[in-house]
Amino acid sequence: MATHTEQLTRPAVRLQGLTRSFADRTVLDGIDLDLPAGQFTALLGHSGSGKSTLLRAVAGLDHEVTGSGQLTAPERVSVVFQDSRLLPWRRVLDNVLLGTDGKEAAERGRAALAEVGLAGRERAWPGELSGGEAQRAALARSLVREPELLLADEPFGALDALTRIRMHTLLRELWERHRPSVLLVTHDVDEAIVLADRVLVLERGRIGLDLTIDRPHPRSYRDPLLGEYRERLLTALGVTEHQGAQEDHQ
């Protein structure tokens, strides 16, 4: 089995000259990007900057992009959205198993639910779950496919602050156990710094900043050494520290 260091020497995703336009507006402007296998990457940008468009392109959900994009294992890609997208007429385990088959699928589904803290909720209906529990079920659904690439589009954006912190811990623990490549789209600078080892800033359709976060895990929001990274990211986003503090409390 390849070590984590060996994984990082080969790209799971390679984008070359990726371009996407809507009417007369270019959203992605010739993006070149490698995402190494096993790396946790976060993508920041203003609303409308093209973050979700880039994620959809990597996931193979947007067929209007030009340029080239190559995934080493596109059949083992999972996507988690802000909305858990659980089918309300199917029980939790059935939602987790959607698109899977084989004798071992149910066993993998139960194991995935246990791993995200939902053991015993297999027969629950989605409407019986809290927002955090629904996102845990969505993560279990992504895990059961044993993805090499996990794409997460603002997965915690609709959760309260305390639940978000708990989900941050869970996502990082799951990544450390399974080591997929992760591309996390977020608008939250602190979320990116605490979770990711590499943070990209999308600006005017291009990667404006590519920053390595060289701090050990687990990380704390209160770590003063993360302040330098935060300042660089806010500057790249065109936000002052004072503005960032105001936005965090809105």
From Swiss-Prot:
**Protein's membrane topology:** Peripheral membrane protein
Listed binding positions for ATP are 45-52
Which molecular-function annotation in GO is an example for this chain?
ATP hydrolysis activity
Pfam families the record matches: ABC_tran (PF00005)
Subunit organization:
The complex is composed of two ATP-binding proteins (SsuB), two transmembrane proteins (SsuC) and a solute-binding protein (SsuA).
**Per the database record, which ranges form the ABC transporter domain?**
13-229
Annotated Gene Ontology cellular components are: plasma membrane
Q: Which family does it belong to?
A: Belongs to the ABC transporter superfamily. Aliphatic sulfonates importer (TC 3.A.1.17.2) family.
List the keywords (alphabetical): ATP-binding, Cell membrane, Membrane, Nucleotide-binding, Translocase, Transport
Q: What does this protein do?
A: Part of the ABC transporter complex SsuABC involved in aliphatic sulfonates import. Responsible for energy coupling to the transport system.
- Compartments it resides in: Cell membrane
Give the InterPro entries listed for this entry. Answer: AAA+_ATPase, ABC_transporter-like_ATP-bd, ABC_transporter-like_CS, ABC_transporter_ATP-bind, P-loop_NTPase
Enumerate the catalysed reactions. ATP + H2O + aliphatic sulfonate-[sulfonate-binding protein]Side 1 = ADP + phosphate + aliphatic sulfonateSide 2 + [sulfonate-binding protein]Side 1
Query: What is this enzyme's EC?
Result: 7.6.2.14
**What is the protein name stated in its UniProt record?**
Aliphatic sulfonates import ATP-binding protein SsuB 2
